[in-house]
Structures are given as C-alpha cells and as structure tokens.
C-alpha cells in the first residue's frame, strides 16, 4: 500500500502539493503514481517563469513502462524546478515526497487548493482504480 502523507493535498491525477513558507507550493507525483509507472528514466519539467493552469499538462515523466503527462494541481507561475531530476530521475522513485519533487508554483488563485483532495479523499481515488 502506498504512503499518503496527511499534510499534503492531492489531485485525482496523482500529483501532490505542499505549501512552503514563502506562499508557494511544491508539486510532485505520488508514491502510488511512481509505483504504477515504474523506474523513471527521464523527466521533462516546465521552465521557471512559465505559467501553468490547474488541470493542464505541464511536465512529462518517462519510465521504462510509459511516458505520462504530469498535470498542474493549481494555477500559477513556476518559480523553481528540481534540476536534480535531469541527472537523477530515479529520485522520483526513491523519494516521491522529498527529493523527487518536480517544480514549485506561486499560485495565482489559492482557492484552487480547496478543490484538491486530502489524504483520505486521495486514498478513495486509488481504491476506485
């Protein structure tokens, strides 16, 4: 069974967000998602300064099994990307909620966070799959 930290919020498309002290949100994919994808071989990230829109694809995770679009859980400006993933995409597998984060977003509409799932709601989504 996948680890689902209770302090994070989740999208039904298997992304997570964590609020940071500066008001931005760090985005990654869940442990469940990386388990489904398998060993990561390449991650394509948005550029710093890009504007992302909630529900739209903005990154790609490529594994030995498949390439999967990564969707923005909230809208805003990308203020940082995890450059470590360029050389070490396997961090997504080994540390989905830590060193395997994808990018950080400064939200344009923080109310979008309220539409995301808590850990219990995300567990229900996994159970339906």
Curated annotation (Swiss-Prot):
Keyword Nucleotide-binding assigned: no
GO cellular component: cytosol; glycine cleavage complex
Modified residues (N6-lipoyllysine): 65
Cofactor binding note: Binds 1 lipoyl cofactor covalently.
Cofactor(s) the record lists: (R)-lipoate
Domain named Lipoyl-binding: residues: 24-106
Superkingdom of origin: Bacteria
Alphabetic keyword roster: Lipoyl
Family annotation (SUPFAM superfamilies): Single hybrid motif
PROSITE patterns named in the record: BIOTINYL_LIPOYL, LIPOYL
Pfam families found in the cross-reference section: GCV_H (PF01597)
GO biological process, one term: glycine decarboxylation via glycine cleavage system
Function per UniProt: The glycine cleavage system catalyzes the degradation of glycine. The H protein shuttles the methylamine group of glycine from the P protein to the T protein.
Assembly with partners or alone: The glycine cleavage system is composed of four proteins: P, T, L and H.
Family (UniProt): Belongs to the GcvH family.
Designated name of the protein: Glycine cleavage system H protein
